[in-house]
Amino acid sequence: MIIAIPQLNYKAGDIQGNSEKIISAIQKAQNQKAELILFPELAVSGALPQDLLEREEFVNACRMAVEKIAATCTQIAAIVGAPNLDSENGIMYNSAYFIQHGEVVDGVHKNILSDYDIFSESRYFIAGEDNTPIRYKNQNIRILFDEYESEYIDKTDSFVIFIGMTPFTVDSSREKRKVLATLAQKYNKNLIAVNHVGSYTSVLFDGNSMVYNYKGKKACQLNEFAEDFQLIDTNKLGTPTLQSPVSQDRIALLHKALVFGIRDYFEKNGFQKAILGLSGGIDSAVVAALAAEALGAQNVMGLLMPSCYSTEHSVQDALALAENIGMPHETIAIKAIYEQYLEALHPLFKDQPFNVAEENLQARTRGMLV
């Protein structure tokens, strides 16, 4: 079976924009004669919609978007992740819709909800109670959300698709490769894992959608921190021939993630410029370098705010950094403002020895100005 794997950068709450991306990928896949196209968990709503899921009009809009997407699937089948409200019973599932012949014909619900870190799915969703394979072109397609549902894999399954979204950590790609290789060998099945790519405020998705053959060998890996589109043939996965992205060391990977996350966050929120304080220290230097790489040095303003505690060396280091990066910079002396704070607080501080409380007023002053 020819399967299209689009790896897309969705936006939380942007149902129309996400749907347009999905439809565009479907049209591309149909033009390339793909038989099935895969989209991850909550592709229509965007990852982490959170309290938007408490608004019935939002969930209904997601359902209408799924129907609009289905209408474009005239020559291809699709698996699309979206919230699914059972209005009759007043419950909602995290579902994978199966689309064929221009309409939704089947689907599965996520059975093991994620409730860790930033995930609180049981607050919004009800867990599904079973998992039945999708029947398509005389093949049984098992749709799972993550490896915790692997107990549903059956010997009659033709291949397995994981549509769960995997947040980025420095070790997430390595761990995912290990898990998929182990499961592929254990169950003797070809496995496909499709992921989100993009930033969601405090969470980053790195893409890295993967395909493993039944021998536990990686057959395909999509790009990290970038949209991508790949076609695979499940009949030709026995001997992997597809090129995969070159792995990087941890520092290089973290650097790439930070630059991508900053750039994507600014783009999604309509920001173009940033103002950063430059102290001459390593912390502000690293932040400035990352911001300049992500946004362009001309879009990052460096603000030097020396005080009576600033050394000439730190001021010169901050100036050298700004000039080396090529970023515009300004200097605002904060001594006068700092002294006004001290004067205002003197009635409270007069009987106390001078300590870090007074020194830290300079940090508060800088924060106010930035």
Describe the function of each predicted region.
Residues 112, 226-233, 299-304, 312-355, ...:
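A conserved beta-strand->alpha-helix junction
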